[in-house]
């Protein structure tokens, strides 16, 4: 199985992908570099597929990966609850392809290619 190293150690890379996954579930749209967006896509697709399964084992697998952050203070909902109650039911009829990557221009500081990744 191939993956991008993203210039980090394996622990740093896993932590970054967990953070980005949680942020994407909460905000449903984030701006990051193209390489990170492409790597994030596969992780988020797997999380949404777990959400569609919806059983206890799937919920525990997702909880082991997603950070425990508040998604909506008004609904008193965290990221995991949002994944299983709001995000996953939207894609009940769709078999994969839950995200869209739109390329932006280069970043001002270092010229890194930027992209917006969002839930379809």
Swiss-Prot record:
One of its GO terms (molecular function) is structural constituent of ribosome. One of its GO terms (biological process) is translation. SUPFAM superfamilies: Prokaryotic ribosomal protein L17. InterPro entries: Ribosomal_bL17 (IPR000456), Ribosomal_bL17_CS (IPR047859), Ribosomal_bL17_sf (IPR036373). It comes from the Bacteria. Belongs to the bacterial ribosomal protein bL17 family. This is Large ribosomal subunit protein bL17.
């Amino acid at each position: 199985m191939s993956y991008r190293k993203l210039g980090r150690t394996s622990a740093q890379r896993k932590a970054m992908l967990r953070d980005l996954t949680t942020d994407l579930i909460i905000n449903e749209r984030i701006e990051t570099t193209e390489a990170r967006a492409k790597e994030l896509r596969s992780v988020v697709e797997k999380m949404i597929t777990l959400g569609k399964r919806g059983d206890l084992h799937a919920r525990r697998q997702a909880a082991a990966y997603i950070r425990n952050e508040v998604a909506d203070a008004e609904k008193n909902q965290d990221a995991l609850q949002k994944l299983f109650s709001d995000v996953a039911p939207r894609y009940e009829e769709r078999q994969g392809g839950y995200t869209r990557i739109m390329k932006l221009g280069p970043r001002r500081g270092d010229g890194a290619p930027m992209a917006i990744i969002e839930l379809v």
